[in-house]
């Protein structure tokens, strides 16, 4: 120990003692304030506080912009019906009987290649306890409502142009308006026009204008369940341009601002990863200014853009999984829903060929459902039986557990699994989606979980993030 250290140590000790004394005095004053009349301690809570209300106000003011941004960007699921698929029909092939034709052809495929529950279950590997339930419900669905979401295609699936495309777009509008008048329209219907890339931009805008104008002329208003699909989006600026286009149409016809929403189709690598390394799709959702309703994965265009050979272009390819995972994270909490792509292996030909295609399609749909992609594309009537079989088996297999856990959560009952509010939302959403598509009945769900439909919806779609305490 040096002479300098010996001389300075008493002074340092004295300073430390003074600091300790000031801290004790400060703490005593804080406790006095906390225990003063009118505080929480005086109100019988039995706790003491140190922070004055001004600190709460300061923190609230600091985070007010964040609170507003969370509400704007992440409003949660809209709570509307979610179709289990989107059926694409070329614009020149659409007729007034298209939906009924798809249902009849799907039923005919079952009659020919799986005429009873046992044979259908054997082909797909449906457990015996579910076989009859699933088969009966699939046939009823194909008879009652074979298509939940119809997209009239004026893009890759369409070969017209010029005056022919004008006429087909106008005819599509007349047919859709008529279907809504007579009650035969699908719950969701719309068109996919050409994209906004320079070579086809004007054509796409013209087709969309003809279709929307025709709906107003023949229906008096835009129908409920109207859905537009914007394909081959690579830059967020293309989404902004589409928003401006819809704003102009709404102003022209005196429609409520924001009336027309649309889906963004992810078919290019640039839509997933921008040149600067950021996730473009997240910026696209923001650029949609609240109009985006879905992100649809384009299996074959996206795979081709990455150089995947034709034989390996499928919705379960690792490249597809990566793209959809990015889409899923970008869309989470925004109210924008993610839709899986399609399979181009069609159930046609011999019974053996049909069964092979059915097994493939059924497996892809079940795989997507397990990954929370609750919607996908169907390109052929023969895919409807396996779409609904996969969906119904998924919801019915998880029905008893989901209903029991949600009922236990609602009653705060004990159980083998401790569920949190987020899990309760997922359980309620699972049951509601099952009811909406026909996999479950409202009555059996109410009995199983003890919750009436309105309470079930309240659990499934609380808006605004974390509930207050």
What is the role of each PLM region?
Residues 15-17:
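Compositionally biased, intrinsically disordered low-complexity segments enriched in Pro/Arg/Gln/His
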């Amino acid at each position: 120990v040096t002479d300098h250290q010996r001389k300075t140590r008493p002074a340092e000790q004295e300073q430390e003692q003074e600091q300790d004394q000031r801290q004790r005095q400060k703490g005593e004053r804080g406790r006095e304030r906390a225990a003063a009349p009118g505080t929480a301690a005086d109100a019988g809570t039995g706790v003491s506080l140190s922070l004055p209300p001004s600190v709460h106000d300061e923190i609230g003011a600091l985070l007010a912009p964040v609170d507003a941004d969370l509400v704007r960007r992440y409003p949660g699921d809209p709570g509307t019906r979610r179709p289990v698929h989107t059926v694409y029909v070329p614009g020149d092939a659409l007729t007034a009987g298209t939906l009924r034709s798809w249902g009849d052809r799907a039923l005919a495929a079952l009659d020919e290649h799986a005429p009873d529950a046992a044979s259908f279950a054997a082909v797909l590997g449906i457990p015996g306890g579910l076989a009859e339930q699933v088969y009966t419900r699939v046939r009823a669905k194909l008879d009652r409502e074979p298509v939940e979401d119809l997209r009239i295609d004026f893009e890759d699936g369409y070969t017209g142009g010029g005056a022919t495309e004008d006429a087909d777009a106008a005819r599509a509008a007349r047919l859709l308006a008529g279907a809504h008048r007579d009650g035969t329209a699908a719950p969701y219907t719309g068109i996919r026009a050409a994209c906004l890339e320079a070579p086809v931009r004007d054509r796409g805008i013209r087709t969309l204008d003809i279709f929307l104008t025709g709906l107003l002329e023949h229906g008096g208003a835009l129908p409920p369940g109207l859905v537009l699909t914007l394909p081959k989006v690579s830059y967020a600026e293309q989404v902004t341009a589409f928003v401006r286009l819809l704003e102009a149409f709404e102003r022209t016809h005196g429609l409520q601002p924001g009336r027309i929403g649309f889906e963004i189709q992810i078919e290019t690598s640039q839509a997933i990863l921008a040149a600067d390394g950021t996730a473009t799709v997240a910026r696209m959702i923001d650029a949609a200014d609240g109009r985006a309703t879905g992100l649809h994965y384009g299996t074959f265009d996206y795979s081709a853009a990455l150089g995947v050979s034709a034989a390996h272009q499928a919705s379960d390819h690792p490249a597809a999984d990566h793209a959809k995972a990015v889409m899923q994270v970008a869309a989470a909490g925004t109210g924008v829903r993610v839709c899986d792509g399609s399979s181009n292996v069609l159930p046609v030909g011999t019974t053996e060929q049909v069964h092979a295609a059915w097994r493939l399609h059924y497996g892809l749909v079940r795989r997507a459902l397990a990954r929370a992609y609750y919607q996908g594309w169907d390109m052929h009537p023969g895919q409807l039986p396996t779409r609904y079989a996969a969906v119904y088996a998924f919801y019915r297999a998880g029905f008893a557990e989901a209903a029991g856990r949600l009922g236990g959560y609602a009653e705060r009952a004990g159980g083998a699994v401790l569920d949190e509010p987020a899990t309760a939302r997922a359980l309620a959403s699972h049951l509601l989606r099952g009811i909406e598509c026909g996999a479950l009945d409202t009555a059996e769900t109410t009995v199983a979980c003890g919750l009436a439909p309105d309470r079930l919806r309240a659990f499934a779609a609380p808006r605004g993030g974390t509930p207050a305490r």
